[in-house]
C-alpha cells in the first residue's frame, strides 16, 4: 500500500483506512482537473516568493499540464491505495520529477486545497447550468410568443378560474428562470472567492501572495480571513445547493403541469409519440415518462440543501472530516440537474398545443369575471355586478362572451416578453465567466 501524505512510522489500520477514505477517491475524480489548475497557480506563486526556482517552476508546470490533459480527456485515475486526488497528483509528479514534485505542497494544506478544488469545480458547473438555463429560457420565450393568442383555462384550487393563455404559461416559467439565476448569481459570488493560502485554516508563516493566486485563477476576490475560509466549507456548497434547488423547483412544477396538461382529461398539449413510452399491457398508452422522471429528480434535488445542512450544521469552526461526506451528495447533483435541463428543453421545443380548448362549453364559466368587469365598465358597482352574474350562473342563464381584453403589463394581451428577456440578459451578463475562463486558459496553455 502506498504511503499517505500524512503517514510517518505507523501504518493505519486497513479497516479504518477503508472507512475513512469512503467514496472520496470516486468523488475526487470530479475534481482532478481543478486540483491541477490550483497547483499551477500555487507553484507560480511559490516561485515568486523564492520557494521554487524559475527552472523548477517551468519543469513542474510542464508536467502539470500533461496531467491536466489526462484529466481533461477523462483518463485520470486514482490508483489503489492512494486516498485522494491531491495525493495522486503529487505521486505522478514525484514519479516523473523526483524530489522536485514534493515541493508543490509548501504553504498549503489539503484543507485549502480541497476548498479550492471545490470552488473551481463549482464555478465551472455554474457556468454550464447558466448556459443550459439560458437555452431553456429561449425556447420558452419563443413558444410564448408563438402561442400568445391561444387561450387555455387558468385554475385556482384545480378549479376552473379565469382565462389564461399559452403565452402566459410558457412565459411564466421563463420569468421564473430569471429569478432562479438571480439566486444562482448570488451563490456564484460566494463561490468565486479564493480560499488558497488559508492552509489548514490558520494561514502560514511563508510570505504567501494570496492576491497573486486570486488573479492567476480568475477569482473575483479572496476569502480574506483564514479561519473563515475554512468555515466556508459546507457553506459554499449549501448556498449553491439552494440556488440549484430553485431551478429544480421551476422544472418540477413545469413537469407537473406538462404531465397534467398532456393527459386525456385535459388534452391541452400533446407530446410527439417518440417522446413518450408505452405500457406492457395497455396498447393505447403514451406515457410522459420524461416529465415524470424530471419531477422526481428535481424533487430529490430540492432536498440537497437540507442534506448539506444536516451534515454540517452542528460543527464548530475549523476542519472536520464530516465535511468529506458533502461531496457525495453535492458533486453528482450537477449532472442530474443538467440532464433535466437538457431534456426539458428538448421536450418543450417539440410540444404541440391544442388551439381550440375553450370551444368546449365546460369552460364557459371561465368568462364570469370578464362579464362582471364588463358590467362594471358600464357603470354598475362591482358588488352588484358580481351578485348578478352569480345569480345568472345559478339560474343557468349565464351566456358568456368568449373574448378577453387584458392590456396591462404581464397580462394575456401584453406579455412583456421583451422586458423579461432583457432581465435574463442582464442577469447572465452579471456573471464574470470571461475572467474565469481567460485565467484558466492562460494557466493551461501558458
Curated annotation (Swiss-Prot):
GO molecular function: argininosuccinate lyase activity
Top EC category: lyase
Family matches, as InterPro entries: Argininosuccinate_lyase, Fumarase/histidase_N, Fumarate_lyase_CS, Fumarate_lyase_fam, Fumarate_lyase_N, L-Aspartase-like
Gene (UniProt): argH
CC annotations in GO: cytosol
PROSITE patterns, per database record: FUMARATE_LYASES (PS00163)
Record's keyword annotation contains Membrane: no
EC assignment: 4.3.2.1
Protein name per UniProt: Argininosuccinate lyase
UniProt record similarity statement: Belongs to the lyase 1 family. Argininosuccinate lyase subfamily.
CDD domains given in the database record: Argininosuccinate_lyase (cd01359)
Cystines in this chain: none
Organism taxonomic ancestry: Bacteria, Pseudomonadati, Bacteroidota, Bacteroidia, Bacteroidales
Cited SUPFAM superfamilies: L-aspartase-like (SSF48557)
Catalytic activity from the UniProt record: 2-(N(omega)-L-arginino)succinate = fumarate + L-arginine
Amino acid at each position: 500500500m502506498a504511503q499517505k501524505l500524512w503517514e510517518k512510522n505507523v501504518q493505519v489500520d486497513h479497516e479504518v483506512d477503508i472507512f475513512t477514505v469512503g467514496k472520496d477517491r470516486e468523488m475526487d475524480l470530479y475534481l482532478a482537473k481543478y486540483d491541477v489548475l490550483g497547483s499551477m497557480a500555487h507553484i507560480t506563486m511559490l516561485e515568486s516568493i523564492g520557494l521554487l526556482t524559475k527552472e523548477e517552476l517551468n519543469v513542474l508546470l510542464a508536467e502539470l499540464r500533461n496531467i491536466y490533459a489526462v484529466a481533461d480527456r477523462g483518463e485520470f485515475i486514482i490508483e489503489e491505495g492512494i486516498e485522494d486526488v491531491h495525493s495522486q497528483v503529487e505521486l505522478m509528479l514525484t514519479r516523473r520529477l523526483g524530489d522536485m514534485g514534493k515541493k508543490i505542497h509548501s504553504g498549503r494544506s489539503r484543507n485549502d486545497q480541497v476548498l479550492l478544488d471545490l470552488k473551481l469545480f463549482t464555478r465551472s458547473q455554474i457556468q454550464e447550468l447558466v448556459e443550459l438555463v439560458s437555452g431553456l429560457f429561449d425556447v420558452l420565450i419563443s413558444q410564448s410568443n408563438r402561442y400568445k393568442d391561444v387561450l387555455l383555462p387558468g385554475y385556482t384550487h384545480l378549479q376552473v378560474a379565469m382565462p389564461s393563455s399559452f403565452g402566459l404559461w410558457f412565459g411564466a416559467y421563463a420569468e421564473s428562470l430569471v429569478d432562479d439565476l438571480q439566486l444562482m448569481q448570488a451563490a456564484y459570488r460566494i463561490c468565486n472567492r479564493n480560499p488558497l493560502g488559508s492552509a489548514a485554516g490558520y494561514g502560514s508563516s511563508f510570505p504567501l501572495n494570496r492576491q497573486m493566486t486570486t488573479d492567476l485563477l480568475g477569482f473575483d476576490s479572496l476569502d480574506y480571513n483564514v479561519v473563515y475560509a475554512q468555515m466556508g466549507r459546507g457553506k459554499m456548497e449549501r448556498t449553491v445547493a439552494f440556488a440549484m434547488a430553485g431551478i429544480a423547483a421551476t422544472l418540477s412544477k413545469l413537469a407537473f403541469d406538462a404531465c397534467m396538461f398532456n393527459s386525456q382529461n385535459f388534452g391541452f398539449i400533446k407530446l410527439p409519440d417518440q417522446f413518450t413510452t408505452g405500457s406492457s399491457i395497455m396498447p393505447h398508452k403514451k406515457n410522459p415518462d420524461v416529465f415524470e422522471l424530471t419531477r422526481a429528480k428535481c424533487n430529490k434535488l430540492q432536498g440537497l440543501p437540507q442534506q448539506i445542512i444536516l451534515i454540517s450544521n452542528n460543527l464548530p469552526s475549523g476542519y472536520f472530516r464530516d465535511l468529506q461526506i458533502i461531496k457525495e451528495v453535492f458533486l453528482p447533483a450537477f449532472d442530474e440537474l443538467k440532464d433535466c435541463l437538457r431534456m426539458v428543453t428538448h421536450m418543450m421545443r417539440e410540444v404541440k398545443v391544442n388551439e381550440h380548448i375553450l370551444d368546449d362549453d365546460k369552460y364557459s364559466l371561465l368568462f364570469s369575471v370578464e362579464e362582471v368587469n364588463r358590467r362594471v365598465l358600464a357603470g354598475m358597482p362591482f358588488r352588484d355586478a358580481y351578485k348578478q352574474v352569480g345569480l345568472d350562473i345559478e339560474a343557468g342563464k349565464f351566456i358568456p362572451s368568449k373574448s378577453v381584453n387584458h392590456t396591462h403589463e404581464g397580462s394575456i394581451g401584453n406579455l412583456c416578453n421583451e422586458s423579461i428577456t432583457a432581465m435574463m440578459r442582464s442577469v447572465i451578463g452579471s456573471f464574470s465567466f470571461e475572467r474565469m475562463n481567460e485565467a484558466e486558459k492562460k494557466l493551461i496553455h501558458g
